[in-house]
Amino acid sequence: MDLKDKSLFIQKCFINGHWLDAKSEETFDIINPSDQAKVGTMPNCSKKDTVKAIEAAKKSWNKWKKLTGKERSIFIRKWHNLILENIDDLALIMTLENGKPIDDSKGEITYASWFTDWFAEEAKRTYGKTIPSTMQGRRIITIKQSVGVCGIITPVSYTHLTLPTKRIV
């Protein structure tokens, strides 16, 4: 694989700020469906690995929810910029792991970057609304808050597009 930035192809799990193997040390092969060549291996995570990741995410969320909208926007903008800086490598990795034509992979990643751009701007607008009530002398006030840690399943067909839309929401 001819990547400009080899550090983008890490064959480990990212849990609590660290790249790790599965506790079982078991792996599975990543196969390019277009030619059946082995692209790499990934840790075969168990329930224990998943629970560890969820616990770490909950701790991180406690910090994330305390950030201002502007501070969140800065993080999301940085992610957006990293996507754009690495679009060629990300597209190559996507093409090799799921067999999409390279132009389709670049298109999907570009489209996904539009979501990170949009969410970076929306993060600044975390204010709520005041809504008129049907009862005299009353107001309805809404607020926007982080929901918390969510489990997501991404389809093989649109892995990069699903990530920013579900991760940020």
Positions of the model-derived regions?
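Conserved small/polar residues in nucleotide/adenosyl-binding loops
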Residues: T159-T165
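Terminal low-complexity tails and localization/encapsulation signals of metabolic enzymes
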Residues: M1-T41, I74, K78, G128-T154
